Amino acid sequence: HSYISLKGNSKEIIGKLGQLLNAVIIVTSCNTNEKQKNKADNPSVLLKNMENSRTAYLICNQKESIVDYKKVLLTLNNARESKEKTLWASYFARFFGSEVTLFYHTYKDSFYQKQLNLNLAFARKMLGQFSIIPSNHKSEDRKTLLDLQALNYADKENYGVIICQTTKDKSFFDKIKGLEEVKVL
């Protein structure tokens, strides 16, 4: 176990935490019954704070419950790296027999749509290497943050796991040098 105490903006701390701990995955909890939208453990606030993180997060409800791995939702978009997240989806499918669903929305911009199509093709090909055939769910909502849509969809359709795309690019330095994930992978 590793522990660290940081002071400052929650979004910046969460973004740096994985690297400071040299973590592969960080487990955190959220309070789905929280009525106040500005609380740090509210799912919508938590997802917004994690969007810059380069470390995978496993988010659990604060209530004890048996986790159901039968259905896994993998969000994909146009701009984020998807290799690590797709590997996590394949892990659940291979070792828990999970059904994997690719969750995405289309873009009006043809370049963004092309990038999304490439990410979808990559995810399908990688999962296919493990004999996993994912189902697809295309959202019609282009305005709401995709991860928040996935949270609502997963709750409605009884998904046990959501794998969100947390790498959000890009500082000027990242654009020149490249994202750390690209170099590692």
Identify the residue ranges that each predicted region occupies.
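Glycine/small-residue-rich hydrophobic helix-like segments
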Residues: 114-168
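Hydrophobic beta-strand segments of well-ordered beta-sheets in folded domains
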Residues: 24-26, 70-73, 97-103, 134-136, ...
